């Protein structure tokens, strides 16, 4: 297991050694040519599992919502725009005073895609850690994602402010 710092030092997560950094070409294939590419994208090429992190502070409506409402909003948007979308549940996780929501879903495009989205809100910024497994034969997708979610450790706010001033 390797320890990775995500969301600009807000949290760290343990990820199995089978994951490797995605190349620019792989990122373009996943996210398209016209979007800003996320810095953090890891792939387990053998099992076709992807982990990525993104931040957004552009959507004004999300800034006013609490974490559960954001997860429900994301689920609603996916339901209206993604064919074959199904939500398996929205869960809440608390780590000391930090709270995040976890959204388990699957949908069908060319292949069945299983996803786990961990949503964390800090002031006006929404942080998203998303895991996607595109191999329908991998029945262990839920435990793989669960282990990643359980390994997330939020850094104390004092440490984060110290990092920002250096």
Per-range role (PLM):
Residues 2-69:
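Secretory pathway targeting signatures of secreted, lumenal, and periplasmic proteins
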Residues 14-17, 44-46, 95-97, 120-126, ...:
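Short, solvent-exposed coil/turn segments at beta-strand boundaries
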Residues 19, 127-166:
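Surface-exposed amphipathic alpha-helical segments
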Residues 19-22, 85, 99, 152:
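Short glycine-aromatic motifs
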Residues 21, 51, 101-102, 115, ...:
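Short hydrophobic/aromatic-rich beta-strand segments that constitute the beta-sheet cores
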Residues 22, 60, 111-112, 138-140:
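Intrinsically disordered, low-complexity acidic/polar segments
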Residues 45-47, 54-58, 108, 122-123, ...:
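Short, flexible beta-strand-to-coil junctions
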Residues 61, 65-122, 164-166:
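Signature of long, low-cysteine stretches enriched in small and polar/charged residues
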């Amino acid at each position: 297991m390797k320890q990775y710092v995500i969301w600009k030092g807000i949290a760290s997560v343990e990820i199995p050694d089978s994951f490797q950094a995605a190349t620019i070409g792989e990122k373009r294939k996943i996210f398209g040519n016209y979007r800003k590419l996320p810095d953090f994208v890891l792939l387990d090429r053998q099992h076709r599992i992807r982990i990525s992190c993104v931040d957004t502070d552009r959507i004004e409506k999300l800034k006013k919502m609490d974490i559960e409402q954001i997860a429900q909003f994301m689920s609603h948007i996916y339901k209206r725009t993604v064919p074959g979308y199904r939500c398996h549940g929205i869960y809440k996780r608390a780590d000391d005073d930090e709270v995040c929501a976890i959204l388990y879903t699957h949908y069908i495009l060319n292949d069945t895609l299983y996803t786990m989205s961990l949503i964390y809100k800090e002031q006006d910024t929404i942080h998203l850690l998303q895991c996607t497994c595109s191999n329908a034969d991998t029945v262990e997708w839920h435990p793989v994602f669960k282990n990643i979610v359980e390994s997330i450790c939020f850094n104390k706010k004092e440490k984060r402010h110290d990092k920002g001033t250096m």
